[in-house]
Amino acid sequence: ATRKIDMAWLGGFTFVQASLRTRGTAVPLVQRAEDARFTSKFITASEGIKGFADLKGKTFAFGAPSSTSGHLIPRYFLGQEGINPDRDFKNTAFSGAHDATVAFVQAGKVDAGVLNASVWDKLVEQKKVDTTKVRVFATTPPYFDYNWTVRGDLDPKLQARLRDAFLKLDAANPAHKEIMALQRASKFIPTKAENYKGIESAAQAAGLLK
């Protein structure tokens, strides 16, 4: 909105916020294929938690307040399951980061938490979480998440070149492999603002848009 940034990597919720602040002019160019069907994982180290009903009266950790996958979508999904975090949890914490949420749960600081599936998979792969203690007990339905967004007044030709550069990235190409690995992307695909209307509706329902 202040024209200080030409391009940014945004989560679904932060894109919605950017879109509203720029009066709908921000343009989402591309997203990872994984972001077209993103999910969040609910985790616990408590044997007594088998489902959402068991969360009532328990302590719970979200990620950052502005996180799509660590707060907004999980909060909305909890509401769909009849759980009001502000009313039903004994205490609600914001860890600030997905890996911190796992650390909170593993250390027993909270009874349960939620994080994005990509980070969970990475931590499991890197053996940075003890899966004999911490387990996934629920997964959200899929939703659109991260994207690369540009200012709406950026030269359309430059927008097209940027989009094409992402779409040409190939994980099988050694020259592209490191970039793709850093983004944990199998490939990039085009996206559009309409894909994030569901997130905007969820944010409004959760009272997170002012």
Report residues per predicted region.
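Short, glycine-/small- and polar/acidic-enriched structural segments
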Residues: A1-I49, A117
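Sec/Tat-exported extracytoplasmic proteins
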Residues: K4, W9-G12, S19-T22, S46, ...
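Pocket-lining segment of extracytoplasmic ligand-binding domains
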Residues: G48, K58-K157
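Hydrophobic residues within well-ordered alpha-helices
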Residues: A1, L55, V105-Q106, L162
